[in-house]
Amino acid sequence: MTHLKQALIYSLVIGSVFATTYASSEASDDNTLANNLIVEYATPQTDKEKQIKQEIELSGVNDTVIDLSNQLFMFKQPLVIQYGGDDGPLYDPQTHQVLIPYGFYAESLNYFEKNQYEKEYGKSAQTGAVDTLLHTLLHEAGHAYIEDQKIAILGKEEDAVDNLATILLLNYVEHGADAAISAADMFAFESEDRPEYYDLGEYIDEHSFDLQRYFSTLCLVYGSDPEAYKNLLDEVENDYLKDRKEFCIEHFDVITENWHQYLKDSDEA
């Protein structure tokens, strides 16, 4: 099967702030595109929030999401990404807004620093936090697109938009696999921070468990390029590894093709 491989995004290196940042490679003067997705920032209340706002702006993640949306998932009603406040990350269907607290970025950064991400994985904690933010923005934008387009989801919507965020990174963002792996690692870090047991209510939660989300994301990354990521699933027991690798290759193709029934490449419109 042929996948859309158009590269919309290029990665940069900016001083010592981030190892990898994202930026738009196609600026559009079209007012319709410009108004498709709107980014707003609440006034930072502390010096820490001011720093976070600046780091988010410098990272270019918003431009990446805007480019992907303009190219693949246009909204009937403009979507607003609102940074700041206490709620989120979440998509609010009542206001058609994605809410991202400044504290979410700070929490992600803390996880990557605490787990010595640069020492263990060769990527800075800032890169891990930015990658996680990008995956989260695409995840929440996925909820918004499902609501906006009235897409029927058979199964957990949270799993569906996790998959969407990951295949968008893999198919359209340069070094998107690295970003997806960072986001998966964040799921693993959160899982390690949990008690050894789940509350009964969590078994009927809309989200899969963090460790499931970790392996599901890695599965798609492996399936996108088995040769490049041949060791990515080595945590899986040998008794299951061969079958899981075969499944992940097929799973990536199926998820990509299924989502492209709803994604609209503007070059083909």
Where are these regions (language model features)?
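Classical Sec-dependent N-terminal signal peptides that target proteins to the secretory pathway
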Residues: M1-S25
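A metal-dependent hydrolase signature that marks the N-terminal structural subdomain at the beginning
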Residues: S24-I100, F104-N110, E257-A269
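Pan-zinc metallopeptidase signature
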Residues: D29-N35, L200-A269
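Active-site metal-coordination segments of metallo-dependent hydrolases
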Residues: Q45-E55, D148-L164
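Active-site-proximal beta-strand/loop segments in catalytic clefts of secreted hydrolases
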Residues: Y83-D86, P101-F104, L138, E147-Q149, ...
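Short pre-active-site segment immediately N-terminal to the catalytic Zn-binding motif
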Residues: E113-H135, I151-A152
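Active-site recognition of the HExxH zinc-binding catalytic motif
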Residues: H135-D148, D162, T166
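Post-HExxH zinc-binding segment in Zn-dependent metallohydrolases
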Residues: K156-R194
